[in-house]
């Protein structure tokens, strides 16, 4: 399981941006027209215009949408190839129970108080192939995790109304809070914003909230990528995980993939 976290690398925003611009310049005809992003029900969820042919960086917001879309395509491939294979090997080798995940969730400062068992159970489901059930727990819990971090660093996570009542801000607003961006890895925030909440990205959180996502979709591509991304996220702040890595000669000398983790499934 720790080897799985070593194989996973959060992609840098700058690398995604350079890839989008590079592909646009190398294949201008293929990127001359916009495209409609369609969900599983055949509905158009977003009309994505093309980038400016003279200056792809002219509209930063539009460029960001293309970055989410480009990242999604790579995430689907990674999920369907190396992550699906790696998870299958894990299932064939082990039957994961909650105790095997203690090292990941116990005393992990990033997990909100009282949510350790929830994460533990969801990850057990995910690693044992119960993907549909796992996604329905992990997506809202990861959203709450980032809300909690934002609160801890002084970000305002609610909108105050004139009558004195308050309403929780939407996830995209939470992940864009200056306080959160100042204190947390922006590449990780970008990844989870695309996975959970962007129509140009995977939009997993909203598809789950509206009952759109299918059982099959939860067992493929970007959903597998999301599940492994959550494991990686938790491993970064797990003291036990750090100690295991520190004391294991095999894990200590593992070569972290520089660019594309697809090369590690041999």
Which ranges hold each PLM region?
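Charged alpha-helical initiation segments
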Residues: 49, 61-132, 254-263
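Charge-enriched, short contiguous segments at helix-coil
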Residues: 191-257
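Secondary-structure-rich domain cores
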Residues: 92-178
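The feature captures two recurrent sequence modes
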Residues: 1-69
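Generic recognition of stable, solvent-exposed alpha-helical segments in well-folded globular domains
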Residues: 81, 114-117, 129, 133-140, ...
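Sequence termini and other peripheral, non-core segments
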Residues: 4-6, 262, 266
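Eukaryote-specific, cytoplasm-facing alpha-helical/coiled-coil scaffolding segments in long proteins
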Residues: 148, 167-171, 233-238, 252-264
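Short, mixed-charge amphipathic alpha-helical segments
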Residues: 110, 173-203
């Amino acid at each position: 399981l720790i080897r799985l976290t070593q194989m996973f690398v959060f992609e840098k925003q700058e690398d995604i941006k350079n890839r989008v611009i590079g592909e646009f310049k190398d294949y201008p005809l293929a990127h001359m027209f916009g495209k409609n992003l369609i969900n599983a029900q055949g509905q158009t969820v977003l009309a994505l215009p093309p980038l400016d042919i003279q200056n792809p960086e002219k509209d930063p917001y539009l460029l960001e949408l293309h970055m989410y879309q480009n990242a999604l395509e790579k995430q689907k491939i990674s999920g369907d190839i190396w992550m699906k294979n790696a998870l299958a090997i894990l299932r064939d080798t082990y039957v994961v129970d909650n105790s095997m995940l203690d090292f990941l969730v116990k005393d992990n400062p990033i997990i909100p108080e009282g949510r350790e068992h929830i994460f533990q159970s969801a990850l057990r489901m995910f690693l044992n192939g119960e993907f549909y059930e796992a996604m329905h727990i992990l997506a809202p819990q990861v959203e709450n995790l980032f809300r909690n971090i934002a609160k801890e660093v002084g970000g305002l996570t609610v909108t105050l109304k004139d009558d004195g009542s308050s309403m929780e801000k939407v996830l995209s607003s939470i992940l864009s809070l200056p306080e959160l961006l100042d204190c947390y890895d922006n590449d990780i925030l970008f990844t989870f914003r695309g996975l959970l909440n962007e129509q140009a990205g995977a939009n997993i959180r909203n598809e789950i909230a509206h009952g759109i996502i299918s059982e099959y979709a939860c067992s493929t591509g970007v959903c597998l990528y999301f599940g492994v991304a959550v494991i990686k996220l938790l491993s970064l702040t797990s003291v036990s995980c750090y100690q295991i890595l520190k004391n294991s000669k095999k894990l200590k000398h593992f070569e972290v993939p520089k660019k594309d983790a697809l090369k590690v499934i041999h």
